[in-house]
Amino acid sequence: MILTTARLNCRPVTVPRLFNRSFSQSFIILKKKSSTPTEKVEEDEIDVNELLKKAETQFKKTLEIQKQKMNEIKQGNFNPKVFNSLVFKNNRKFTDIATTSLKGKNALLITVFDPKDVKTVISGVLAANLNLTPERVPNNDLQLKVSLPPPTTESRLKVAKDLKRVFEEYKQSSLKDSLGTIRGSILKEFKSFKKDDAVRKAERDLEKLHKDYVNKLHDQFQKVEKSIVK
């Protein structure tokens, strides 16, 4: 009887069933907790890659802006926009009363919109100290011819100096389009992410990208400089 009672007392034991329920609940909790960091890492990787694309887009834009600026400087007085920044009496802009075009290889042609403004344009160009003299075109009351002097060694050196200044500005300065400013802005955005392997790699990739575009910017400058100082 004692043996029988022992056996009967052992039957109601439900430890296995309680153990299974507890294990199942623990597994679900762990699964939820482990999935959240993974999703966050994937989101971070997507975000930092987007920032790298953003940086390269802005770097390319800087390269194009410098190219445009250097071409304008290279043209010097041969640039039809040479008078566009002039402002006359009563705050009237040159572009409001006249326009300029190239005339052959060694001259500019100013076309004034109103005959009454011809004298204003002539005196304004002379006062700008550009070493350029507008002359009336015979039988045309609206046009002025500006003969362009051939470039000298001094003028070439000045152009080269201006080109170097533009290069330095777009490499590293407070300009919003300078490579240095763009790099600093992207690095600041990286700080909003947790410092994991993906972010560290993105920072290294940014530094490499920045260095590549500094070299491209410098190559662009040297190419234009060589065409000036021969």
Curated annotation (Swiss-Prot):
Lineage: superkingdom: Eukaryota
Coiled coil, from the record: none
GO molecular-function terms, A-Z: ribosomal large subunit binding; translation release factor activity
InterPro entries named among the record's database cross-references: Ribosome_recyc_fac (IPR002661), Ribosome_recyc_fac_dom (IPR023584), RRF_sf (IPR036191)
CC per GO annotation: mitochondrion
Main location group: mitochondrion
Localization of this protein: Mitochondrion
Record carries keyword Protein biosynthesis: yes
Keyword line: Mitochondrion, Protein biosynthesis, Transit peptide
Keyword flag Transit peptide: yes
Organelle transit peptide: 1-24
Biological process annotations from GO: mitochondrial translation; translation
Pfam families: RRF
Similarity section: Belongs to the RRF family.
Function per UniProt: Necessary for protein synthesis in mitochondria. Functions as a ribosome recycling factor in mitochondria.
Leftover remarks: Present with 1440 molecules/cell in log phase SD medium.
Annotated protein name in UniProt: Ribosome-recycling factor, mitochondrial
Gene: RRF1
